[in-house]
Amino acid sequence: MTWPEKTLPTTDASEKRSLGAGVFRRCDGCSHTHDAAELARTFEVCSQCGHHHKLDADGWRRLLLDDGELAAWDEHLVPNDPLRFSDGKSYRDRVAALHKKGRAKEAIEIGRGRLGGRDIAYGAFVFAFMGGSMGSVVGEKITRLFERATREELPVVLLQASGGARMQEGILSLMQMAKSVSALERYRKARLPFLSVLLHPTTGGVAASFAFLGDANIAEPKALIGFAGPRVIENTIRQTLPAGFQRSEFLLDHGMVDAIVPRPEMKAYIGTLLQHLTAGRRARR
């Protein structure tokens, strides 16, 4: 018996192939496999179980703002490295790498848009940029958001998804809590409405400052909302926390948020609130 002279072509076993990468997505809630384009059409909400995956800033713009258009404010502001912080990689290099990848310039975008035909001052955290952490630039942009909204007599809609204060800026990041809340208090004296939208996750210094100070605090389903994470709390107090602790539903039951609104209903819900809260007022141009 002789071996055949022709052999089949071989492949390098070290080459890893990803079938359907970027084409199919598995739901984190029910493990159903989705066409990625289908999830994009539903703004990252699973059609089988209703699980809400993270939606980026561009997706939120398209979902909430008329025609998805935002006249951005203060885009020139970018983070500095005042402490020359390094944890194996310098803070400056981390920011530069994110900019090189085409990510946002910072962990928040602000500007003027229209929601349901009504002018609003709009802000949305960018979780993909260092976990939506709040440093000096984020605090400054939130402050400017409220200050400009006060001058132009605009309602503020602010979407929050953040891990808290940015450790690379130390005490400078913590000072943004007081600074932003001071601007918010001046805004409130003008008797203008602030709608706070709490996304997954909203934690740390953001949760401890302006996140719960809205005239209406609206949360997405099953969002993690709180100061420290559940594991940190359990390790500190050495007790087991109640089921669902720090989730939207738990907070609603205990009066910490005013409503839980599924993502597909968010624009209509906010539009109705604005209609009631801004009746008889017109924004300045």
UniProtKB/Swiss-Prot annotation:
GO terms for biological process: fatty acid biosynthetic process; malonyl-CoA biosynthetic process. It is an enzyme of class 2 (transferase). Keywords: ATP-binding, Cytoplasm, Fatty acid biosynthesis, Fatty acid metabolism, Lipid biosynthesis, Lipid metabolism, Metal-binding, Nucleotide-binding, Transferase, Zinc, Zinc-finger. Its main location: cytoplasm. GO terms for cellular component: acetyl-CoA carboxylase complex. Pfam families: Carboxyl_trans (PF01039). A zinc finger (C4-type) spans 27-49. It is found in: Cytoplasm. Its cofactor is Zn(2+). Residues 23-285 form the CoA carboxyltransferase N-terminal domain. It comes from the Bacteria. The keyword Nucleotide-binding applies. Belongs to the AccD/PCCB family. Acetyl-CoA carboxylase is a heterohexamer composed of biotin carboxyl carrier protein (AccB), biotin carboxylase (AccC) and two subunits each of ACCase subunit alpha (AccA) and ACCase subunit beta (AccD). PANTHER family: ACETYL-COENZYME A CARBOXYLASE CARBOXYL TRANSFERASE SUBUNIT BETA, CHLOROPLASTIC. This is Acetyl-coenzyme A carboxylase carboxyl transferase subunit beta.
